[in-house]
């Protein structure tokens, strides 16, 4: 199992990175996210009792309405009130199903130092995707800024061009990954 953690601001291209990597990889690629369990908890405790759909948390038209709730539940409630590694433990359990398989698992929402360290500790790669000029780029919530000064990423991708340019970068990344490269710094030209 190869694990790739992806970090970046909201709407920077983390899920698009996963989708493109999945297209270009020769081995099966699976997506996990710390927020999957978070969204399931929000759904079960808040949305479902009111007859609302789980898809509201992922739908581009409705998910922003829930962002503050997700941030509060995930950070202020679970991480601070329970324990810092609450989501890490949940994701670690999910990773077990891929152990000893020739697959790539992409974790599309690495946001905190302990998540970053966990991925590195199991031999995973860390990718930082940035996208200059995003609206709401000044969101100061800890889940948006905790890794801003982290220098230990294996790859930095500046997603400042077209989708085709981003796709080309991801194809190059897959090539570097297949060749066994540990560090592959790439910059998009837009």
Question: PLM ranges: what are they?
Answer:
Residues 10, 90, 114-122, 128-190:
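Small-molecule kinase domains that catalyze NTP-dependent phosphoryl transfer to phosphate-bearing small molecules
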Residues 6, 107:
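Hydrophobic anchor at the beta1->P-loop junction of P-loop NTPases
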Residues 17:
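Hydrophobic positions on the alpha1 helix immediately C-terminal to the Walker A/P-loop
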């Amino acid at each position: 199992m190869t694990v790739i953690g992806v970090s970046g601001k909201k709407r920077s291209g983390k899920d698009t990175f996963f989708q493109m990597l999945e297209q270009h990889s020769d081995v099966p690629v699976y997506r996990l996210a710390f927020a999957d369990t978070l969204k399931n908890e929000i759904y079960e405790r808040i949305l479902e009792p009111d007859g609302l759909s789980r898809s509201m948390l992922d739908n581009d038209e409705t998910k922003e309405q829930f962002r503050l709730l997700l941030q509060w539940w995930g950070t202020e409630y679970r991480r601070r009130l329970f324990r810092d590694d609450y989501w890490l433990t949940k994701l670690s359990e999910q990773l077990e199903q891929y152990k000893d398989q020739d697959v790539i698992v992409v974790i599309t929402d690495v946001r905190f130092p302990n998540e970053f360290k966990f991925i590195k500790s199991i031999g995973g790669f860390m990718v930082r995707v940035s996208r200059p000029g995003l609206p709401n780029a000044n969101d100061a919530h800890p889940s948006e800024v905790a890794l801003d000064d982290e220098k230990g990423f294996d790859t930095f991708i500046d997603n400042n061009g077209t989708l085709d340019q981003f796709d080309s970068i991801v194809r190059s990344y897959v090539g570097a990954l297949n060749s066994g490269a540990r560090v592959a710094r790439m910059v998009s030209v837009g």
